[in-house]
Amino acid sequence: MHRYPQTKYVSLGVPTWLYGHEPSTPLATHIAKYFVNSVREDTILTIAFGGIIYTPGSAGTLREIFQNAVQNHYLSFGIASPRVCMGKQFWTEDVPVYPMIHQMEERGRYKNLLLTLSDDPIEIETVLKDFQKTIPYE
């Protein structure tokens, strides 16, 4: 952050206390720590109205994907936030969550998912920025 300071946006990095391999992001303007990972995950999903990018992960990442799918489906907080699965091979072949969720949405089992699959950082940025244009700010 010292090399590339910015004051336009505020962001929050929330690595879990439990897993040492999840370091804080150097790009966040603020850092928080939770001692209970499930509380951390729920908090992140609750406040992430601007979107979430899922990179290849393990059990916790899968839980977050489905937790957020439920929040978006029911519009639990009055808004559905965009979600991007980054890593086409991982999310379609290694851990084929994307095709399953996409099919459930097409069949009407899930709604409001706003789910994108991409390997392209520019496309991902565009998806998130385009969503920001639709949010009515007071």
Descriptions of predicted regions:
Residues T43, Q71-Y74, Q103:
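A generic secondary-structure signal
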Residues M1-T16, T55-P56, L62, A69-D94, ...:
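Short, acidic/small-residue loops that bind anionic groups at enzyme active sites
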Residues S24-P26, R63-Q67:
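A short secondary-structure junction signal
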Residues K33, Y54-G57, M86, T116:
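Glycine- and other small-residue-rich loops at beta-strand/loop junctions that grip anionic moieties
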Residues S81-E138:
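C-terminal functional extensions of proteins
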Residues M1-Y54:
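Acidic/glycine-enriched connector segments
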